[in-house]
Amino acid sequence: MNIDNEANHIKWLLNELFVDLPSAISMGREAIQIPDESIHSIIKAAGRLRVCNHSIIISLFKLHEIKQVYGRFLGTLPREVTECFFCDVKEIERRNICKFRSKHVAHIIDNDTRKPISLEKAESLLSSITGHDNSQTLAFYDWICPEDWIEKPCVVTSIQNLRDYCWKMPGGDLKRP
């Protein structure tokens, strides 16, 4: 692949994540604010959180994939442009986000056991990522996108900075492939 086009591909991939992550985080925050303790409200909130968290997991996995697919190209960019991105990807790996995505969110069968992942194992993996209670989940969301995220170090800021850098590179202003 032509290096000039790699900047364009990365820019468009990051642009999607720049939209998807804040949206899912915002909806997740809203879902946590249960209006009452009725079983209907709890089930509704749990379903919304599940959808939001799965979207977040898939989006964060895409950052991991961008590093895998475009790592050589990203390595040619100035360190100050990629440092936060690479740190975020390391944190994604440390939090077992890729494992949860591959064992539960994106597949019905666990490749290790050749069976569906148990609900207990899925819950344990998710809790290791998002935390065990709402305050920890909100802290996880803040790592990705704090409510007033502009200019604050977070995953969305590193996505924006790398996207903007790629946009200005030769070939970065091309239409979506």
Regions found by a protein language model. Give the residues of each.
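Amphipathic alpha-helical interface segments
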Residues: 1-96, 111, 119-177
